[in-house]
Regions:
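Terminal low-complexity segments of carbohydrate-biosynthetic enzymes
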Residues: 4, 113, 227-249
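Conserved donor nucleotide-binding strand/loop of the catalytic core
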Residues: 36-39, 50-84
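Cell-envelope/extracellular polymer assembly enzymes that use nucleotide-activated donors
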Residues: 4-6, 37, 187
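A conserved acidic beta->alpha catalytic loop
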Residues: 42-51, 97
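Acidic donor-binding loop at a coil-to-helix junction in glycosyltransferase catalytic cores
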Residues: 182-188
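Acceptor/aglycone-binding surface of glycosyltransferases and processive sugar-polymer synthases
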Residues: 66-84, 89-92, 98-182, 208-219, ...
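N-proximal low-complexity "stem/linker" segments adjacent to membrane-targeting elements
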Residues: 1-27
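Catalytic beta-strand/loop signature of glycosyltransferases that borders the donor
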Residues: 157-158, 196-206
């Protein structure tokens, strides 16, 4: 059975890329005849993002835009979207056009065919690709992911990658969310893993933004990533399975 896909796009001051991002997603999903909605969460933008979205909504009938009802911030915007999407599964997609719309199709079909609860992206496995990844950010990424792999005993090598797809029931089983910032992209997959949901990972492509400024502040995120990583580690070892996925009898 086909599932309705929600593509969740948090957007803060993305006037330079939001049109390209929405149209890119829409064109691919229509071509592949995938039932979908494109849910853009306007994260308190002060530029022309809202104006552009209003115009794009006349061209892209599957576009639904909402305003972030929570405080400003990437994690808050994603949480707002996760509380409001209406699909059977949801994929997090960056507004800066750094993700590839083609990967949505591959992940969607794998989720259905394998009956997985989640599908994760890896930019560093064979078939994955990064374009113009900043060297300092790349080095920190590899160190962080190596630490996570060691602590959790994982083969998966790109937990910090935001590009992932989840079934709606899986998202429900990951609540309540703790992270309010970019560390939410680590909280979600680690909870999938420690709570016993089924998952696989596929290669995906990432390219550095061409317009606008990155919203990720590395100096501010270190302690937040550490908090989430060790929270999930404690949940794994100390909660005696209280949060594990309920088995269907």
């Amino acid at each position: 059975m086909d599932l309705k896909l929600s593509v969740l796009i948090p957007a803060h001051n993305e006037e330079g890329s939001i049109r390209e991002t929405v149209h890119g997603v829409f064109d691919i999903l229509v071509r592949e005849k995938i039932l979908h909605e494109i849910l853009v969460v306007n994260d308190h933008s002060t530029d022309r993002t809202e104006e552009i979205l209003n115009k794009v909504s006349e061209e892209v009938l599957s576009l639904r835009q909402i305003k972030n009802s929570l405080p400003n911030g990437f994690g808050y915007a994603v949480r707002c979207g996760l509380n409001n999407f209406n699909g059977d599964c949801v994929a997090l997609f960056m507004a800066d056009a750094s993700d590839s719309p083609d990967d949505l199709v591959k992940f969607y079909r794998t989720l259905i065919k394998g009956n997985y609860d989640a599908v994760f992206g890896s930019r560093f496995m064979p078939g994955g690709r990064t374009i113009e990844y900043p060297k300092v950010k790349l080095r920190l990424n590899r160190i962080t992911n190596s630490l996570i792999r060691l602590l959790f005993g994982l083969q998966y090598d790109d937990v910090t990658n935001a590009f992932k797809m989840y079934r709606a029931e899986t998202i429900g089983g990951l609540k309540p969310f703790l992270a309010n910032h970019f560390n939410l992209t680590v909280e979600l997959p680690l909870k999938v893993i420690v709570r016993g949901y089924s998952y696989t990972w596929l290669p995906n492509q990432w390219s550095n933004r061409k317009t606008g400024a990155t919203k990720l502040k590395l100096k501010e995120m270190g302690s937040r990533y550490i908090f989430i990583i060790f929270y999930c580690l404690m949940e794994k070892h100390l909660t005696r399975g209280d949060y594990l996925k309920k088995k269907v009898l």
